[in-house]
Amino acid sequence: MAAFSTAATERFVNKMVKHHQKYFPEWSRSLGADELGEFIRHGIERANLHGFETELNIARYLHVMQALGPNFDESGEYPWAERLLNRRLPPQAKMNHLRDAADYELEARRIRNANRD
């Protein structure tokens, strides 16, 4: 999206706001519309830094970011994500690896939480 116009970027932000409100309603309400828009803009910037430029890959990056946190790629909490995102891979391959690793992380978290109960 780095090459897209400001108008195209804002259309994409609005599309992603609606998407998140539909599929993640509680989470979206907890942020509010303005903060959700800022979250998405931040995600677009982070995705672009890692070589993701298509709407599909940026949307997928936003889903990972929503699940792991807005700065998952640099927080130190997920060193595997930082290593993966710094690898020289085609964007689609990098995204596939990122999604698989994030899914694994979320499943491991779910199991840890279930074992605490």
Please report, for each region that a protein language model flagged, where it lies by residue.
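A contiguous, surface-oriented mixed alpha/beta subdomain in the mid-to-C-terminal portion of proteins
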Residues: 1-117
